[in-house]
Design a protein with these regions (language model features):
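Conserved beta-strand edge residues that scaffold enzyme active sites
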Residues: 1-2, 51-52, 131-133
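A short acidic, Gly/Pro-enriched loop at the edge of an enzyme's catalytic core
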Residues: 2-12
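Short aromatic-enriched loop/helix-cap "lid" or pocket-rim segments at secondary-structure transitions
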Residues: 8-9, 56-60, 140
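A short SAM/SAH-binding and catalytic strip from SAM-dependent methyltransferases
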Residues: 10-26
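Short, hinge-like loop/turn segments at secondary-structure boundaries
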Residues: 12-13, 61-65, 144-145
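SAM-dependent methyltransferase
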Residues: 25, 45-112
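C-terminal lobe and adjacent flexible extensions of AdoMet/dcAdoMet transferase-like proteins
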Residues: 111-150
Length: 150
């Protein structure tokens, strides 16, 4: 865990939905630990999925059929959590298919909650950028640029 890191840094990043993989229960602890590894005035930059990103972009089913592999990805957003079930079927040399399955869970953190936790963990939010990966109308990601103030 970050409390074991002895060095101090001018900037820390958490990209590709890292905070969405952290439960609401553990999020404040994570932010406190990020604060510990930053120099005074250091920056913390991270992205999170927006509600639109979870509800309209990530949720749904995708299937991919390529030669000797078939992948099914099924994502369901409910109670502020996105559960994604991934199943891979792969053709073996004997002609049979093997099956592997796994699930991942991401949690939606509302902007209001993030702002509250960041303030409580001594971060000033310098900017929040809306990022549109899939549509020009609605942001599916938010990028937070924060500065350690204490």
């Amino acid at each position: 865990a970050l409390e074991n890191v002895k060095e101090k840094f001018n900037c820390a990043t958490a990209i590709f939905d890292v905070l969405n993989y952290i439960s609401k229960r553990d999020l404040k602890k994570f932010l406190k630990e990020i604060n510990l590894v930053l120099n005074q005035g250091g920056y913390f930059i991270f992205d999170v999925n927006s509600a639109f990103g979870f509800e309209e972009v990530a949720q749904g089913t995708i299937t991919i059929d390529v030669e000797d592999k078939f992948i099914a990805i099924d994502a369901n957003f409910e109670d502020n959590k996105l559960q994604t079930d991934i199943t891979l079927f792969e053709k073996q040399e004997n002609g049979f298919f093997s099956k592997q399955s796994d699930s991942i869970i991401q949690e939606y953190h509302p902007k209001k909650s993030l702002l509250k936790f960041l303030k409580e963990c001594n971060f000033e939010v310098i900017d929040i950028k809306e990022f549109n990966l899939h549509t020009s109308e609605n942001a599916d990601k938010l990028i937070f640029i924060c500065k350690k103030i204490a």
